[in-house]
């Protein structure tokens, strides 16, 4: 610690602050673990997603075959893919349950309105990650789910037509749809999610965990 | 409103509890992945639309509304407004009171909405859509 302190003055204070930070005892309760578990599910998604991305090929011709290879040939591939699948489902369930806890304990009330808002964005982002990831194996269900998604967006007023073209990569479904969903799934949405997560945690640290009711 | 706050230290009490729960979660994940692995299904076929197409469970409630409401625009706007209302919760419910028993109207409305979403999800899971 002295070695570090000499090179990074003040780091001992930071470590002390983290280690001795008092946590209200009412948070030792399963309902107060749901947010942390959602984060853990997200981290599992980052790690397993990284491994899947090593083998996955985002083109209509190769996508299905590459997922098939991950499932049947790559060592631990089937396990990694199953973990990614289950952590995705659990993440959505957990983010929803976490929202119920925050609502029923009234923890979203002043001064924590903005953190509720960040949480809502994180819920929508989770659903967006699930939607874009669903297309990637390029199975019958995943393909047609995305087609219906694009159709549904297309019937929105004003922005609908543009949104549909942007999702499909053209007036009709094109090969671009898969690359767009892929980029959204592995780059854009995860980065935006991390941004909102950081904001979420900074606000918790600044405002403190809500008092017991 | 002034209550005594009992606190526990982050190290080691809180961090070990969190670590234990995290390990249980990872264990559950591995059990699920082992017992119910994600299998391959048929590859995408642009020429054949599957019959009775249903989205994953977390989109079912919105899909059921989309299918049930005859007007397509309304079918999109209703789930949209429901999600939008979620964002507005802190501004729709402005009282300082936090105990659910002391804010019956807001909690009642919120619970009713959640039950509607749960019922629509159940309905969507059990019925055959389209085809």
Swiss-Prot record, chain A:
Compartments (UniProt record):
Cell membrane
Question: Which residues of this UniProt protein bind heme b 1?
Answer: 98, 200
Q: Which GO terms describe its cellular component?
A: plasma membrane
GO biological processes: photosynthesis; respiratory electron transport chain
A Pfam family (short name) is: Cytochrome_B
According to Swiss-Prot or TrEMBL, what is its membrane topology? Multi-pass membrane protein
Q: Which InterPro entries match?
A: Cyt_b/b6_N, Cyt_B6_PetB, Cytb/b6-like_sf, Cytochrome_b_N_euk/bac, Di-haem_cyt_TM
The protein's UniProt keywords, in alphabetical order, are:
Cell membrane, Electron transport, Heme, Iron, Membrane, Metal-binding, Photosynthesis, Transmembrane, Transmembrane helix, Transport
Q: How is the cofactor bound?
A: Binds 2 heme b groups non-covalently with two histidine residues as axial ligands.
Amino acids binding heme b 2: 84, 185
One GO MF term attached to the UniProt entry:
oxidoreductase activity
Residues annotated as transmembrane: 30-50, 88-108, 114-134, 184-204
- Quote the SUPFAM superfamilies the UniProt record gives: Transmembrane di-heme cytochromes
| Binding locations of heme c | 33
**Entry keyword Electron transport:** yes
| Cofactor(s) this protein cannot do without | heme b; heme c
Task: Tell me its family.
Answer: Belongs to the cytochrome b family. PetB subfamily.
How does this polypeptide assemble, per the annotation? The subunits of the cytochrome bc complex are a Rieske Fe-S protein (PetC), cytochrome b6 (PetB), subunit IV (PetD), and a diheme cytochrome c (PetX).
* Biological role: Component of the cytochrome bc complex which donates electrons to the photosynthetic reaction center.
PANTHER family membership = CYTOCHROME B
Q: What other comment is given for this protein?
A: Heme 1 (or BH or b566) is high-potential and absorbs at about 566 nm, and heme 2 (or BL or b562) is low-potential and absorbs at about 562 nm.
Q: What is this protein called?
A: Cytochrome b6
Q: What is the lineage of its organism?
A: Bacteria, Bacillati, Bacillota, Clostridia, Eubacteriales
